[in-house]
Amino acid sequence: MNSADTQEPKSFNHTDMWTAFGTTMSGALETDPRAVVVLADIGAHLFKAAAIADPNRVINVGIREQLMMGVAGGLAMCGMRPVVHTVAAFLVERPLEQIKLNFAQQDVGAVLVSWGASYDLSEFAFSHFTPGDITVIDSMPNWTVHVPGHPQEAADLLLESLPGDGRVYLRLSSQVNRYPHAVRGTSFTPIKYGTRGVVLAVGPCLDAVLSATSMLDVTILYAATIRPFDATGLCAAVQAVNRPNVVLVEPYLAGTSAHQVSSSLVSHPHRLLSLGVRREMEDRHYGTPDDHDHIHGLDARSLSNSINSFLG
């Protein structure tokens, strides 16, 4: 098995994505005249200094998520670049109608930045769980979806998302990989090469996947951007292995990107195993994110069992 070239670890002061977002976005407010932050109370502490420096560039509407989307939509129609932030459940699910009407219907863009999906905020239990956020975003056309696995990637992808007028969803997590990898547009990053199949690891799942497959002769692809889906990269990886086995490991609902895999490989007979947050259960326990990873089979040991069984 040959290892692919990966990015050398960068010197980065932030150990979590939330802090990286606040620092990076505060810096962007100083240099980008179009950028404006819209909040629903959560995350306001990240922008105290920025709000004092320019109150018109940090707008906190209080716990009114529908209003937050309306304000952001209006700003976008005026030529600004709104960055909208709160907990994932309150960013994507609660104001879904306003997202559709204020952005998709008006054909304007924004950067929606979430925190806490799928079950990072386990201390608040089921009301704050959002394993279906990517599925919700997928129901609307023309969204770019970033799922970083490291604070440095989160910062890089945020800065990449600010220019232009596209619709972007940036999913921040408390779970992180040990090292960042280079953000290469929408292309998947090869981590290592093998012959028995291809494992696509999304965002913070990578370290567990690497541990689970350390003794397996498989190709590992890493995705920090999952929409648009890198069909070309996946096809090339599958064509290069001896067995067309594909394992998809996502930190949200299992099978969320299965249709993308099938469409990408429509001309290539293949087998697919989709791993992620289980759809057949609603786990309402508190616990920790690691506990929930184990329940849903996303810890390294469970992944190893599932992948080994699939490969045979």
From Swiss-Prot:
**Record's keyword annotation contains DNA-binding:** no
Annotated Gene Ontology MF terms? magnesium ion binding
Residues in the signal sequence: 1-28
Question: Which SUPFAM superfamilies does the entry link to?
Answer: Thiamin diphosphate-binding fold (THDP-binding) (SSF52518), TK C-terminal domain-like (SSF52922)
Q: What does the UniProt keyword field contain?
A: Plasmid, Signal
The induction text for this entry reads: During the interaction with host plants.
A Pfam family matched by this chain, by name? Transket_pyr
Using the record for this protein, list the coiled-coil segments as residue ranges, or answer none: none
Against SMART domains, the record matches this protein to:
Transket_pyr
Query: Where are its TM segments located?
Result: none
- The domain of life for this entry's organism is Bacteria
Its biological function?
The FAS-operon encodes genes involved in cytokinin production and in host plant fasciation (leafy gall).
Designated name of the protein? Uncharacterized 33.6 kDa protein in fasciation locus
**From which source organism is this entry?**
Rhodococcoides fascians
Q: Which gene codes for it?
A: fas3
